[in-house]
C-alpha cells in the first residue's frame, strides 16, 4: 500500500456516543454554477451558488481556538475538519491560499483538540459539486492527473493526522442524476469525455 503507516492520534477514541461537529477550514467547497440552470432562486441563493474562489481560509487562529474550547465544554468529542484549501499539502502546495495552515500548524491544532478530549477527523470533499478547493484539478475529474492528486492529498492527510480512525471523503450530492442531466455535464466534462467512462 502507498498509504503510510503512522502512529494513531494520542487522544482516547470516544466510547459510547460520538458527539461530533463539522467545521470547514477551507471555503472553496462550492463550484461556480451558471445561474441560468438554477431555476427560480432568491438573490441570496444565487449569490451563494455563484461564489468566486475565496483566496483566504475561513478562520482566524483565535476564533478557531474559541470554537474548539466551546465544543469541548459542550461535550463534543469529535470534530470533522473539512480541510479543502485550508491545509498546505506537501504534495500539492499549489492548492494553498492566504492563511492556509502549515503541516506544523495543523498538527498543533490536532494536539490542542486531543488535549481537550476531542478526536480530529479529516474530511476532503471529492464530490464534483464541492471540489472548488482543488483548483485546476476540479476540471480534470476522472483523469490520471486528478486521481494522482487525490491519492497524494489523501496520503498527506493520513500522515499529518497520524492515522485517523475515520476519513470523510464527502461525495454528498454525487448522484446518477448528474450523469443524466445535460445541464450538469459541465461539472464533469474533461477533455471531451465524461466521468462515467472510467
Language-model region placement:
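Feature activates predominantly on carbohydrate-active enzymes
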Residues: 2-198
Amino acid at each position: 500500500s502507498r498509504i503510510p503507516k503512522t502512529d494513531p492520534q494520542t487522544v482516547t477514541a470516544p466510547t459510547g456516543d460520538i458527539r461530533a461537529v463539522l467545521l470547514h477550514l477551507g471555503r472553496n467547497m462550492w463550484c461556480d454554477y451558471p445561474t441560468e440552470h438554477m431555476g427560480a432562486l432568491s438573490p441570496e441563493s444565487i449569490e451563494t451558488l455563484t461564489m468566486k474562489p475565496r483566496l483566504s481560509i475561513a478562520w482566524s487562529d483565535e476564533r478557531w481556538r474559541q470554537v474548539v474550547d466551546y465544543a469541548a465544554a459542550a461535550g463534543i468529542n469529535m470534530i470533522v475538519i473539512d480541510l479543502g484549501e485550508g491545509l498546505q499539502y506537501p504534495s500539492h502546495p499549489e492548492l494553498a491560499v492566504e492563511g492556509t495552515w502549515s503541516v506544523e500548524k495543523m498538527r498543533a491544532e490536532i494536539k490542542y483538540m486531543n488535549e481537550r478530549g476531542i478526536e480530529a477527523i479529516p474530511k476532503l470533499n471529492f464530490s464534483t459539486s464541492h471540489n472548488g478547493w482543488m483548483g485546476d484539478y476540479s476540471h480534470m475529474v476522472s483523469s490520471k492527473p486528478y486521481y494522482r492528486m487525490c491519492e497524494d492529498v489523501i496520503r498527506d492527510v493520513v500522515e499529518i493526522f497520524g492515522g485517523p480512525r475515520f476519513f470523510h471523503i464527502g461525495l454528498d450530492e454525487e448522484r446518477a442524476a448528474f450523469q443524466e442531466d445535460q445541464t450538469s455535464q459541465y461539472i464533469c466534462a474533461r477533455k471531451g469525455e465524461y466521468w462515467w467512462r472510467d
